[in-house]
C-alpha cells in the first residue's frame, strides 16, 4: 500500500505540472497572436522609409551617407544579438547563439575583434560567458517592445560605424517563419547596400517611386535622418520577429510538455491499477486461505 500511496502522489504531482504547462501554452498562444500583429504592423513603416530613402539616393547620387560607405580597413566588427529575456522556449535561443558563435569564430579568423550589443538577458549572459566586449545592452523589454527603449543601445553601434571604428555591423535574431518553424538569422546591417533599397511587390515588380519632393532644410539632412530611422526600423523589425518566434516556440514547447505529462500520467495510472489489482488479489488469497484452514 505504501507503493500505491507513492504512485498516487506522483500522479497528483504530474497532474499539477500539466495544469501549469497547459496554462502557459494558452497564454503563449494569446501572446503569439499579438506578437504576430506587431510584427506585421512594423513592416509597412520600414518599407515606406526604404522607398523614400531609395528615391532620394537615386535623386542625389553624388552624396553617400556614411552607412553606405565601406570601412574595410577597420579591425573590429560589431554585432547586435537579439535573444529572449526568459527561457522555456525550446531550442530557440540555443540555435541563434550557436549561429552567433560560428560568426564570431569566422570574424576572429579574419583577424577582427568583436564589439557586441545584447538585446535580451539570454544573449547578454552568453556574451559575458564568452568574455566578449559588450558596448551596450537592453534587457527586460517585456511583451511589447518599444522603439525608444532600443534606440540608445543601437545608436552605439551606428556611431561606431559612422566613425569608421567597425568594418561592419551584423544583426543576429530568430526569424519567424510560421507557428511551427523559426530559424536563426545573421544579416549584415551595415554597410547598407543598393540591393537593400530594391523592394519587390508580391508580383515581383519594383514599386514606382516617381515623387517630387521639396526638401527642408536640404536633401542631405533628410537622407541622414531617414537612413538612421531605416536602420532602427530594421532592428525593431528583428526584435518583433524574435518575440513572435519566442511565443510560438514557447507555445509548442508547452504543448509538448503537456502531451508528455499526459503520457506519464497514463503510464503511472496503469502501474497504480496493476499494484491495486495485485493488492486485492493478495487479500482475497489470504481470505480464501484462512477460510480453508477453518
UniProtKB/Swiss-Prot annotation:
Subcellular location: Cell inner membrane
Main localization category: membrane
Gene Ontology annotations for the cellular component aspect, listed alphabetically: plasma membrane; proton-transporting ATP synthase complex
Bilayer topology term: Peripheral membrane protein
Top-level lineage group: Bacteria
Keywords: ATP synthesis, Cell inner membrane, Cell membrane, CF(1), Hydrogen ion transport, Ion transport, Membrane, Transport
InterPro entries for this protein: ATP_synth_F1_ATPase_gsu, ATP_synth_F1_gsu, ATP_synth_F1_gsu_CS
Function: Produces ATP from ADP in the presence of a proton gradient across the membrane. The gamma chain is believed to be important in regulating ATPase activity and the flow of protons through the CF(0) complex.
Binding partners and assembly: F-type ATPases have 2 components, CF(1) - the catalytic core - and CF(0) - the membrane proton channel. CF(1) has five subunits: alpha(3), beta(3), gamma(1), delta(1), epsilon(1). CF(0) has three main subunits: a, b and c.
Protein name: ATP synthase gamma chain
Organism name: Paraburkholderia xenovorans (strain LB400)
Species lineage: Bacteria, Pseudomonadati, Pseudomonadota, Betaproteobacteria, Burkholderiales
Amino acid at each position: 500500500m505504501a507503493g500505491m500511496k507513492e504512485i498516487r502522489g506522483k500522479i497528483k504531482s504530474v497532474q499539477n505540472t500539466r495544469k501549469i504547462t497547459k496554462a502557459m501554452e494558452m497564454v503563449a498562444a494569446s501572446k503569439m497572436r499579438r506578437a504576430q500583429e506587431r510584427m506585421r504592423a512594423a513592416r509597412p513603416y520600414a518599407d515606406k522609409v526604404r522607398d523614400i530613402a531609395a528615391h532620394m539616393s537615386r535623386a542625389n547620387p553624388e552624396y553617400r551617407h556614411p552607412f553606405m560607405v565601406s570601412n574595410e580597413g577597420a579591425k573590429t566588427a560589431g554585432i547586435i544579438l537579439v535573444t529572449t529575456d526568459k527561457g522555456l522556449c525550446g531550442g530557440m535561443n540555443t540555435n541563434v547563439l550557436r549561429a552567433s558563435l560560428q560568426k564570431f569564430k569566422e570574424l576572429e579568423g579574419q583577424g577582427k575583434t568583436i564589439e557586441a550589443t545584447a538585446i535580451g538577458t539570454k544573449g547578454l549572459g552568453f556574451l559575458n560567458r564568452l568574455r566578449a566586449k559588450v558596448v551596450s545592452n537592453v534587457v527586460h523589454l517585456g511583451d511589447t517592445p518599444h522603439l525608444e527603449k532600443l534606440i540608445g543601445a543601437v545608436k552605439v553601434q551606428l556611431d561606431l560605424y559612422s566613425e569608421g571604428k567597425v568594418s561592419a555591423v551584423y544583426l543576429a535574431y530568430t526569424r519567424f517563419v510560421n507557428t511551427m518553424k523559426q530559424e536563426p538569422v545573421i544579416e549584415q546591417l551595415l554597410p547598407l547596400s543598393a540591393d537593400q533599397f530594391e523592394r519587390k511587390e508580391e508580383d515581383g515588380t519594383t514599386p514606382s517611386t516617381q515623387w517630387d519632393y521639396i526638401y527642408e532644410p536640404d536633401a542631405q539632412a533628410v537622407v541622414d535622418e531617414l537612413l538612421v530611422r531605416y536602420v532602427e526600423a530594421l532592428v525593431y523589425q528583428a526584435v518583433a520577429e524574435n518575440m513572435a518566434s519566442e511565443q510560438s516556440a514557447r507555445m509548442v514547447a508547452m504543448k509538448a510538455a503537456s502531451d508528455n505529462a499526459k503520457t506519464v500520467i497514463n503510464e503511472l495510472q496503469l502501474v497504480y491499477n496493476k499494484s491495486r489489482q495485485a493488492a486485492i488479489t493478495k487479500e482475497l488469497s489470504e481470505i480464501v486461505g484462512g477460510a480453508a484452514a477453518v
